[in-house]
Structures are given as C-alpha cells and as structure tokens.
Amino acid sequence: GDIIHSNDSLYQGSKEFAVPKNRELTETIPFSASHIDMYVEVKGYIETAARSTSPLKLEVNNLSTWVNFNNEVTDDELATYYPLSDVKKQSYVYRFNILKQTEHPCLKLYDSDNKEIFSMQLADFLEKHPEINIDKNETIIPILIEFKSIGVEVSIPDWAIEDVKPEF
C-alpha cells in the first residue's frame, strides 16, 4: 500500500428536513470535526558525525483509517502514519491529522539508522495532560519531545498553554 503521512481535515454533519413542494428552504447543518490536529516537535536530538544526515523519522501506529456516517471512528482497519517533518533550528516539527481516536495510537521516533530511540502511547500523554480537551470540535494535541543529557522529557509546548485568569 501507499505510505500515509496524514489524513485530511474531515468534518461530518447531518440533519433531516423536508422541503415543501415548489418552495425554497434554508437550513443550517452543524458540522463536527472527525479529526484531531497533531503537532509534534522534537528538540535536542543531535546525531553523531558517524551517522548519516537524514532526519529523524516519526511513526504513529494503530490509527483508524475511517469514520462511519455517525462520525464514529472504527477500528476495523488500523494503519501506520509516517508524518513528514519540517526541520527548523535544532528541532523537527511534524504536523499531521489523525482521526478522533486516542486509545491505541503509539508514537515512535527512529534515528537515521532506523533504530527506535523513543516511543509513547498517546493515551498516556493525554492522561498526564487533562488540560488538552479532545472533546471540543477543533482539537490540537501539541507534544514537545526534548532530548536532554539526563533523558527524554515530554511536555506541552509553551505556546500551547493557555494561562487564563479571568478577572471578576
């Protein structure tokens, strides 16, 4: 099969209505997103000179490939996505869509020798970050993976944290 980098931004809406004979009718159909925007940034990973210069590879597996007419994600066919990276100063950025399913996906990073250097379950990340609301219509899951001298830290990028302090 073909390599999948992302799925399209998908929206679904339905509404029953009857158009009177020989009349016009205007109705609004509410749409809801079937997808989640993913933003994964990897910082601090420096390959040794002995390795090739090709970038890190992100693999996201156990992803559903379609939704039904009720906008429900199905687990009938699972796929692996290979998001494309945008190499920035000292970081790799992956932007892609997945269907609204968060139980099974696993993110894995591979170095240029195709050796797995990091993996994480998306469900575990979301459990640690309840501030990410995957139930809202337009959802983004921002993930920052930082390689440091003491190990790997996974967090939410600073730009994604909404520090709301309502004043009364």
Pin down the residues of each PLM region:
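Hydrophilic extracytoplasmic domains
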Residues: 105-168
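Residues at beta-strand starts and edge strands
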Residues: 23-25, 34-36, 54, 103-105, ...
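N-terminal onset of structured domains
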Residues: 47-49
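Tryptophan-paired
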Residues: 51-130
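Generic detection of short hydrophobic beta-strand segments and adjacent strand-loop junctions
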Residues: 15-19, 27-29, 79-84, 96, ...
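Short, low-hydrophobicity acidic/polar segments
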Residues: 1-34
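A short, Gly/Thr-enriched small/hydrophobic beta-strand-prone motif that recurs across taxa
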Residues: 31-45
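Intrinsic-disorder/low-complexity, polar/charged segments enriched in Ser/Thr/Lys/Arg/Asp/Glu/Gln
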Residues: 24-26, 37, 89-93
